[in-house]
Amino acid sequence: MDRSGFSDFHVHSALSDGADAPEAIIERAIELGMPRLGLSEHSFAPYYADHSLDAQARKDYIALMSRLKEKYRGRIRLFCGIEQEYSCPINAEGFDYVIGSVHYFMLDGDC
């Protein structure tokens, strides 16, 4: 299938709940001819702590994406995104875009 011109902005790596390292995902997107790719790791949620970014991991992710944007410049346009759970505080600083999501509903203070 020809994926030239196709972009994906809802991609999770092993930094949250995906299986592959960010660079492996980027390399595959380049192989497929994708001109743009947005990684969108999960924002921190206490009920999803093993698969979401805490404050330090969030900073590390933004820094990593900055380095990868430079490394892959001219081969693919990269975007640093975050998938933000509706029930958690929003901090979009450092991100190119935010995906709003609802994974859990709060009922009487519990998920």
Positions of the model-derived regions?
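An N-terminally biased module of ancient metal coordination in phosphate/nucleic-acid-related enzymes
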Residues: 1-84
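Non-cysteine beta-strand/loop elements that form the S-adenosyl-L-methionine
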Residues: 38-40, 96-106
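Acidic/polar active-site rim loop that often engages polyanionic ligands
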Residues: 107-111
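Catalytic cores of alpha/beta
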Residues: 86-93
